[in-house]
Curated annotation (Swiss-Prot):
The gene is plyE. Its main location: secreted. GO terms for molecular function: pectate lyase activity. It is an enzyme of class 4 (lyase). It catalyses: Eliminative cleavage of (1->4)-alpha-D-galacturonan to give oligosaccharides with 4-deoxy-alpha-D-galact-4-enuronosyl groups at their non-reducing ends. It comes from the Eukaryota. This is Probable pectate lyase E. Residues 227-254 are annotated as: Disordered. Its cofactor is Ca(2+). Glycans are attached at residue 175. Pfam families: Pectate_lyase (PF03211). Belongs to the polysaccharide lyase 3 family.
Length: 254
């Protein structure tokens, strides 16, 4: 019986609406879209590209010419880039035709690198060191599970990164055979449509410091009981701000 009453204001609104303003819609589309730069070309590698020193990708799209295998665990042979200790990868777009994205064998810097469609993981931080891994700018989307997998020790800083439609932005390895204390500092993140922003193992002393904005992200920081038994899955302990998960709730909307 209330339908006519609801319909009348809508008709009046339509009758007196202002003319269509395309600039308004363009602004909304730009805000909601994934801000990946335009590609300057494409490169397909038959094997992983090893990087020592600095590799500037010139904003070309890089891939391996293969179909994503989903969440089936790959290895170094499936990566697009493998960065040696201390290497820098910048100004590159990782295409959808790959499995393992980028691997770091030690400390590394990832600057203005974009993943169009994440397969198994976008970025895997490996090795046994305790250095610093820096992710500056860039972004990733369409990750069924993890974007950044932190297997090594040390510190990860993630600055001004955009992530959309994801399982986890960052996950400290929950069941690696060798475990470490890991820290992650995230600032200026723009996250939307995700399950959890961060996952850490607080029983190993992991900490996460987080700032930025998040829209439609179910959990910001999740604590797990990590294990060094690769045959077991880590147990979830809880989520929300704590001594290990350092942020102010709620994060602002993007």
């Amino acid at each position: 019986m209330y339908q006519p009453l609801l319909l009348l204001p809508l008709l009046l609104t339509s009758a007196f609406a202002t003319p269509h303003d395309p600039t308004t819609h363009q602004a909304l589309d730009k805000r909601a879209s994934f801000p990946i730069p335009s590609s300057k070309g494409s490169v397909t590698y038959s094997s992983p590209k090893s990087v020592s020193g600095t590799f500037d990708g010139g904003l070309k799209t890089y891939g391996r010419g293969v179909k994503c295998s989903g969440q089936k665990e790959g290895g170094d042979k499936d990566a697009v880039f493998i960065l040696e200790d201390g290497a820098t990868l910048k100004n590159a777009i990782i295409g959808a035709d790959q499995i393992e994205g980028v691997h770091c064998k030690g400390s590394c810097t990832i600057q203005n690198v974009w993943w169009t469609d994440v397969c198994e993981d976008a970025l895997s931080l490996k090795g046994s060191g305790s250095g610093t891994h820096r992710i500056i700018g860039g972004g990733a989307r369409n990750a069924d599970d993890k974007v950044i997998q932190h297997n090594s020790g040390g510190k990860v800083t993630i600055q001004d990164f955009t992530v959309q439609n994801f399982g986890k932005l960052y996950r400290a390895c929950g069941n690696c055979s060798k475990q470490f204390k890991r820290t992650v500092e995230i600032s200026g993140v723009k996250a939307s449509s995700g399950k959890s922003l961060v996952g850490i193992n607080s029983n190993y002393g992991d900490t996460a410091t987080i700032s930025g904005c998040a829209s439609s992200v179910k959990e910001i920081c999740v604590e797990y009981e990590g294990t060094d038994n690769n045959d077991k899955e880590p147990k979830k302990k809880g989520s929300g701000p704590s001594n290990a998960c350092k942020y102010k709730e709620p994060l602002s909307k993007c």
